């Protein structure tokens, strides 16, 4: 039975105790750890979360609504809503604001403090009539559910739409870089460039909007490329980092993708926490359907938030069950 930590984990303890940021070199070394060392790395990540994370032991829970679905012109390889793919998916235009209010109220009454309006498509470079309808939805939620943090994920934004979202009091805006930016065109999509997303992030931040930006694991990336994504997120100084685990969907190019092992995913979550001690790290897609019995482990590997109540085109878990999970996880902080 071993009595000492792996030297690279010991080095990480020493570095983080000084308050110095995790270096790319040390993160890469941690990414090469054998599976037998993962629980020690998870323990370190949980300690860092307990000491530094913005939520101070609380779980950041959010829920989303697919307010406009399908027929997206972008060719994201994992997505059922792309018209380039043949997945079966519900198709509908922007829903009525009463439906948005109904779903937001349900989440709010179950104790969920953040609610996101999500639409399919490239985004909004200008303020269009449809975008104005979304602004109206945001205003309605603020009026009728005071205290709810209203969020959105509407794709790439131009200057004017970003400024309007700030004026209407959006709390967080989600737009993911998904992978190491250098591999975006190959692994995710080539109908748009990752720099269009990065430009949106910078517009949002310049308008004072908190940015929710992360990635997806299991699309063909290497561990080193996951670390590249993690450090790109640090350079962008985002507020919330959602980490998704690919749920392969029939009719998409990734329908037969090989799953990433649980130790690899746990290492990724832990390294993300070590690189982002104070940020909210949110476990999103794949938590229930792919990780199943191991989702608690990944929450202890540095995550302090999750998406609950379902995703855009795949099922999730009911909110009451997730609230019980949150109560149990809080005992480890």
UniProtKB/Swiss-Prot annotation:
Transmembrane segments: none annotated. Keywords: 2Fe-2S, 4Fe-4S, Biotin biosynthesis, Iron, Iron-sulfur, Metal-binding, S-adenosyl-L-methionine, Transferase. GO terms for molecular function: 2 iron, 2 sulfur cluster binding; 4 iron, 4 sulfur cluster binding; biotin synthase activity; iron ion binding. Homodimer. PROSITE patterns: RADICAL_SAM (PS51918). Catalyzes the conversion of dethiobiotin (DTB) to biotin by the insertion of a sulfur atom into dethiobiotin via a radical-based mechanism. [4Fe-4S] cluster binds at residues 72, 76, 79. It is an enzyme of class 2 (transferase). Residues 54-287 form the Radical SAM core domain. InterPro entries: Aldolase_TIM, BATS_dom, Biotin_synth/BioAB, Biotin_synthase, Elp3/MiaA/NifB-like_rSAM, rSAM. Pathway: Cofactor biosynthesis; biotin biosynthesis; biotin from 7,8-diaminononanoate: step 2/2. Binds 1 [4Fe-4S] cluster. The cluster is coordinated with 3 cysteines and an exchangeable S-adenosyl-L-methionine. [2Fe-2S] cluster binds at residues 151, 212, 282. SUPFAM superfamilies: Radical SAM enzymes. This is Biotin synthase. Its EC number is 2.8.1.6. One of its GO terms (biological process) is biotin biosynthetic process. CDD domains: Radical_SAM. PANTHER family: BIOTIN SYNTHASE, BIOTIN SYNTHASE, MITOCHONDRIAL. Belongs to the radical SAM superfamily. Biotin synthase family. Its cofactor is [4Fe-4S] cluster; [2Fe-2S] cluster. Pfam families: BATS, Radical_SAM. NCBIfam families: bioB. It catalyses: (4R,5S)-dethiobiotin + (sulfur carrier)-SH + 2 reduced [2Fe-2S]-[ferredoxin] + 2 S-adenosyl-L-methionine = (sulfur carrier)-H + biotin + 2 5'-deoxyadenosine + 2 L-methionine + 2 oxidized [2Fe-2S]-[ferredoxin].
